[in-house]
Every structure is written in structure tokens, then in C-alpha cells.
Regions:
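Alpha-helical substrate-recognition element adjacent to the catalytic core
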Residues: 4, 10-120
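Short loop/turn elements that form and flank the Walker-type P-loop nucleotide-binding site
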Residues: 23, 137-138
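Surface-exposed amphipathic alpha-helices with a cationic face
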Residues: 73-77, 134, 155
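Short, high-confidence coil segments that cap the C-terminus of an alpha-helix
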Residues: 81, 138-140
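Short, structured coil segments at secondary-structure junctions
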Residues: 106-107, 156-158
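Donor nucleotide-activated moiety binding/catalytic core segment of transferases
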Residues: 121-137
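Acidic, divalent-metal-coordinating active-site segment for phosphoryl/phosphodiester hydrolysis
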Residues: 125, 130, 146-157
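Conserved SAM-binding loop
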Residues: 143
Length: 158
């Protein structure tokens, strides 16, 4: 079944979406930190040395939504696409992650988090997540992520 692809235009500083073409439903990945969630207020915990990852993650309860990206996720879901959350957050932060998604009306089909003791780079962790997604029947074709290295990894594994 084909679903409409979306075009974004901006008028009076407000985004507006319109249907332009029909496309098959897609599996679409969204990152959390820096993509759906504004982490500006807690970035300092990991930009200085030593990095304080515990404080960084504990402060996620104060994250603000990135409204434009959330709107895209909502519209894509409404158009029939499957939304997959792939985050570098450790699994122990599953509850606040799901709460953020719920509080911001982000419907999703699956959530993938890193293991609690997995300290590998995001590119490695998310590549492994991609293999798990495919094992679970997903075939992501689009990804929204704020890190260039992760975006490049998604491209290389297309």
C-alpha cells in the first residue's frame, strides 16, 4: 500500500507539510539525544574532562523537545511509516526515554538502547542495532541523527 511522501515548506516561520507523491511505507530511524531531545543544557557534562556520563543521563529529565523533528516523526507515523528509535542511551534509562516519547506524542514501533555496560562508540553500537532491527524484520531506509559519524555509518550500511 502506498503512502504519501511529505514536502516541508516554511511560511511565517512555521513549517507546513503537504503530500506530494505516493510511496511504500518505510522504516525510519530517529535518534534521541540531540535529534528528538534538546540536550543543550546537559552537554557540558560530557564536553569537559573527565566526562560525567551519569550526570549527563540523569539530567535528561529536563530535556526539551526539538519540535520540528518531532513534527516530522509524527507526520511520518501518521502517513503509515514505521518509526524506530535508536539511541545511545543505556538501557537503564529506558523509563525516562519512553516517558519523553509519550509526553511528546511520539508514536513508535520499536526502541533500541545500548547495553548498560556498553561503552563502545555510537557508530559501533548503532551498527549493531541496525543488524538487530533487520533480524526483527525492519529495513530502515531513512535515519535522523545529529552526529555526522553515525549518519555516515547509516549510509554505508544502506
Amino acid at each position: 500500500m502506498a503512502t504519501p511522501a511529505l514536502r516541508l515548506s516554511v511560511s511565517n516561520n512555521r513549517p507546513r507539510f503537504t503530500s506530494i507523491i505516493e510511496s511504500d511505507p518505510k522504516d525510519i530511524i530517529f535518534d534521541m539525544d540531540g535529534t528528538l531531545a534538546d540536550i543543550t543544557h546537559r552537554r557540558h557534562y560530557v564536553e569537559s574532562k573527565p566526562k560525567n556520563w551519569d550526570a549527563f543521563y540523569r539530567a535528561m529529565i529536563n530535556d526539551k523537545p526539538v519540535e520540528a523533528v518531532i513534527m516530522v516523526a509524527q507526520l511520518l507515523k501518521t502517513a503509515g511509516h514505521r518509526i524506530i528509535i535508536a539511541t545511545g542511551r543505556p538501557r537503564r534509562y529506558n523509563i525516562p526515554t519512553l516517558r519523553f516519547l509519550q509526553d511528546n506524542d511520539i508514536s513508535y514501533d520499536a526502541v533500541y538502547l545500548r547495553g548498560d555496560t556498553d561503552y563502545r562508540p555510537d557508530t559501533v553500537v548503532k551498527e549493531q542495532m541496525l543488524h538487530k532491527m533487520r533480524d526483527n524484520g525492519y529495513n530502515p531506509t531513512i535515519a535522523f541523527d545529529d552526529r555526522k559519524s553515525v549518519v555516515e555509518m547509516w549510509r554505508l550500511n544502506d
